[in-house]
Amino acid sequence: MKKPLLVSFLLLTLILGACGGGSLEGEEVTITGALIGTDQDGFRAAFEPFTEETGIIVSYQGSDNFEQEIQIQMESGDTPDFALWPQPGAVVDAANRGYLTPLADLDIDLDQYQNDFSSYLVGLGTVDGVIYGGANAANLKSIVWYQP
């Protein structure tokens, strides 16, 4: 049986915040992604105040083979709670294959989310009108300047 995976590429703290509260103290949330090295260290450190406030333990595991590993995990049904994909196209594929949990299935105010973020960022985590996640970072790989 497939375990649905929640993708989150800025929504992570919003979603975890919605899960906050004493009733979840001691619970662990697992996250995997492609952040490694100092990026991984910084990402882990960013959740320390959240853990102190809520008691929810956030466990992040980064890998330079994330894309291959997450495919194997999805196919086996042994997925983390959250995944940070570096490519939006991979999110589309995972959603189309039924591996992702729509944010509407969680206690997330999607109207507020869409008001708070640009339509472009919302679109990165949307597949066929269903929102599965959102961008926590963007990289500019190239740019073309034109001045007439």
Please tell me what each predicted stretch does.
Residues 147-148:
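N-terminal capping loop/helix in small sensory signaling domains highlighted by a polar->aromatic N-x2-3-F motif
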Residues 26-37, 56-61, 81-82, 132:
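Short, well-ordered beta-strand elements
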Residues 82-83, 143:
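A residue-level structural signature of the nucleotidyltransferase/glycosyltransferase Rossmann-like core
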Residues 1-30, 52:
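Short, low-complexity disordered leader/linker segments with a strong preference
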Residues 68-79, 97:
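Short helices/loops that flank or line small-molecule/ion binding pockets
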Residues 88-144:
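Hinge/lid segment of periplasmic solute-binding proteins
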Residues 62-69, 88:
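Short helix-initiation/N-cap motifs at beta->coil->alpha
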Residues 37-57:
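Short, polar/charged alpha-helical segment
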